[in-house]
Amino acid sequence: SGGAGAQRGVDIQLKRKGFHLPEFAERVRASDDYALLEDREWVIEAIFEDLGAKHSLYEAIEPYLSADALLSSNTSTLPLASLLEGVPEARREKFAITHFFNPPKVMRLVELIASGSTEAALRTTIEQTLGKIALECRDTPGFIANRVGCYWMAAGVARAREFDVSYELADAAFGRAFGIPR
């Protein structure tokens, strides 16, 4: 089940010290019981990058969300317009993409692709409650991070080849220096 899969993810993060403090894992509840969403102000969908699966999940959880609840996707590749096709009309003004940079416990940036009242509400939550930096993005392929990141990595590989630098050395030299935690 999805809840069991999510729990395995929590267990893996505990082993890898993925939480700032181990007790933070107690705040994560892995479950298939969508009724647990009824009183939530913000629900973040973070399942695999399959548009049909995301649409199915939105349809399944919609009856449990309050009218005011914000819903966002942590996608890093799917366009907002495509995701909105699976979101009920009444929820669309409360929907956005909130792409958290990985690993989120270290990286402060969150790409925000939204419209209407959702953008202001999520920006406030991201910045004031989570202590992160919200980057407003247009609904373009790869948003900002993947577009720049892919170019940056490709340029790094090209320069490493050009100057006969091993990939391991290039990675060690630039990873942490540019804020890449691993």
Indicate where each model-derived feature is located:
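Rossmann-like dinucleotide-binding core of oxidoreductases
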Residues: 147, 154-172, 178
